[in-house]
From Swiss-Prot:
Gene3D superfamilies from the UniProt entry: Ribosomal Protein S4 Delta 41, Chain A, domain 1 (1.10.1050.10), RNA-binding S4 domain (3.10.290.10)
Matching SUPFAM superfamilies: Alpha-L RNA-binding motif
Coiled-coil intervals, chain numbering: none
Subunit details: Part of the 30S ribosomal subunit. Contacts protein S5. The interaction surface between S4 and S5 is involved in control of translational fidelity.
CDD domains: S4
Protein name according to UniProt: Small ribosomal subunit protein uS4
Annotated keywords: Ribonucleoprotein, Ribosomal protein, RNA-binding, rRNA-binding
Gene Ontology terms for molecular function: rRNA binding; structural constituent of ribosome
UniProt function note: One of the primary rRNA binding proteins, it binds directly to 16S rRNA where it nucleates assembly of the body of the 30S subunit. With S5 and S12 plays an important role in translational accuracy.
Length: 205
């Protein structure tokens, strides 16, 4: 297992949940956190603890976004019309790395970030190497021609462990994806329950 995989699954172990729904997650075999004290029974969390855990879980799901970046997205969500929690999810789903993952061009969120950073992705015909790039409705995302036959790209498109959501229209024969609409929380195929309202409460303290 690579260091990147170890870090990824450490998030699963810390949360005690298989947050991406992957068959190889270690929490499929055990239900305690990482480290020598991971098997200790946890006491009831305070309201703050519950809110913090919800934030850590959502940050972890989106490839462990930094606190600075995550908080900036939250602030933007509060400035938009409507429910701040829903807005937060919508902004996270508009990230280019998220759309690349949803389109099944790669197997994991972590791989999506690296794939973009290495210049394998185009948006509306232009190469974009910033994983946090904000996709707009109608944007066409595509895998660069020379990257379409990479083994891990071909394997990812065949993964049966997750489906492509209806707000991303994918043509796997061309390796293209069109962002159809900004989703609501209920539209997003999370493997575990996400609670953005608790994150709003956390930052509103």
């Amino acid at each position: 297992m690579t260091k990147r995989s170890e870090a990824k699954y450490k998030i699963d172990r810390r949360m005690g949940q298989n947050i991406w729904g992957r068959p190889k997650s270690p929490v499929n075999r055990r239900e305690y956190g990482p480290g020598q004290h991971g098997q200790r029974r946890k006491g009831k969390l305070s309201d703050f603890g519950v809110q913090l855990r919800a934030k850590q879980k959502l940050k972890g799901y989106y490839a462990n976004i930094s606190e600075r970046q995550f908080h900036a997205i939250y602030v933007e969500a509060t400035r938009l019309k409507g429910d701040s929690g829903e807005n937060l999810i919508g902004l996270l789903e508009r990230r280019l790395d998220t759309v690349v993952y949803r389109a099944k061009f790669v197997a994991t969120m972590f791989a999506a970030r690296q794939f973009i950073n290495h210049g394998h992705v185009k948006v509306n015909g232009k190469r974009v190497n910033i994983s946090s790039y904000k996709v707009k409705v109608g944007d066409l995302i595509e895998v660069k021609e020379s990257s379409k036959q990479l083994a891990f790209v071909l394997e990812a498109s065949q993964l049966g462990e997750r489906d492509t959501p209806d707000y991303v229209e994918v043509d796997h024969s061309k390796m293209t994806a069109k962002f159809i609409r900004v989703p609501h929380l209920s539209d997003v195929p999370f493997a575990v329950q996400m609670e953005p309202h608790l994150i709003v409460e956390f930052y509103s303290r």
